[in-house]
Amino acid sequence: MSRLDTELVNRKIARSRELAKKYIKDGLVFVNEKNICKPSFNISDSDIVEYTGENEKYVGRGGLKLEYAIDKFNINVKDKICLDIGASTGGFTDCLLQNEAKLIYAVDVGSDQLDLNLRKNVRVLNIEKTDIRDFKKLYPNISFDFICTDVSFISLKKITEYAVELLKENGEIVFLIKPQFEVGIENIGKRGVVKDKKLHIKLLYDLINYFNMLGLDIIYLEPSPIKGGSGNTEYLIYMKKNQFGEQFKTFNDVEKIVSKAMTPTEKTK
């Protein structure tokens, strides 16, 4: 007997246990024609397991968010050295691989999260138990053409200066902005959702000003096509390292972007 989530990986139905758990909890897995929503459910080799969802393009749905940014903002990562901050299971890393990045440093404070196939890929360096704020001390001679970030439980203000320090001149950055980790706990509603439109506008302007202060030009800002796990509206911001002496490029259409992003029920305040 073995756990259902483990067996999904063994049978090549899911690429990782994290993805297997998601399939199961989303009600997409049947055992002997019975829907099972418990990852720890025990099955035998003779049990018939069926997955009823669509094939995943990336190991995590974050890959679809980065794919959207790459297509929308016309970003080219081919043959570039990239850094994925907060790699987790590797959705962003997988997307970079499929877009022909030369080498990807997948960094995360956790461990045993990155998809096994990504760990085996010679173009991926799996750097676990590492805070990006300590990265420069550990790898003092490395700089990056492209940096992407999808982090939780920490404000982007806590890590951006370290990312900029690692970025080559005229290097590119894509950040996924998650409002629930930027507005303060007192402004978070039920299930961790930030519904107040004014808070979205304020935090975006605040971050943009901060990014400019650190030497980044704001090229594009767009709502993510996929909401966060709790239903939060998220944003993708594309930036470049400013060339010394040039006037900073900023972004003034935040209200329009937020209105575009939020559903009518989210715009009530």
Tell me what each language-model feature is:
Residues 89-101:
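Conserved SAM-binding loop of SAM-dependent methyltransferases across substrates and taxa
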Residues 233-269:
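Flexible, glycine-/basic-rich loop-and-beta segments that form/coincide
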Residues 1-47, 81:
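A basic, amphipathic helix-loop patch mediating RNA/tRNA/ribosome contacts
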Residues 157-174:
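A short glycine-rich, Lys/Arg-flanked "PGG" loop and its adjoining helix->strand segment in the class I
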Residues 105-158:
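S-adenosyl-L-methionine
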